[in-house]
Curated annotation (Swiss-Prot):
Cited InterPro entries: Ribosomal_bL19, Ribosomal_bL19_sf, Translation_prot_SH3-like_sf
Name of encoding gene: rplS
GO molecular function: structural constituent of ribosome
Function in brief: This protein is located at the 30S-50S ribosomal subunit interface and may play a role in the structure and function of the aminoacyl-tRNA binding site.
Domain of life, per lineage: Bacteria
Protein name as annotated: Large ribosomal subunit protein bL19
Amino acid sequence: MSQLKGQNLIESVNQHQLKDVPFFKPGDTVKVLIKIDEGNRKRVQIFEGLVIKRQGRLVTETFTVRKIFAGVGIELTFPVHSPTNEKIEVVSRGIVRRAKLHYVRNLSSKASRIKEQR
């Protein structure tokens, strides 16, 4: 009985910490606005790229975004409901048949383009 109370308590805390985020899935191009504290300054950094994977559920859910900068692939993993994420915008929707797009890492930048939904 006490475990049931504990589970309900965990679920209520999880529901309280969830943020409203737009629907997106692997293959979509998203723009993530991240709050950064640099000493006494606060600024917002934009990271735009292709969503490679999305995993977890509720508060522990994360997603990985990949972009090419100066010929080098950069991947960052963000918690979906993190307070440092100011905003997540979906730039375009992609058409893919996989849930995890790890194969994109081995493709050239031209070959890694994803078809867009119209």
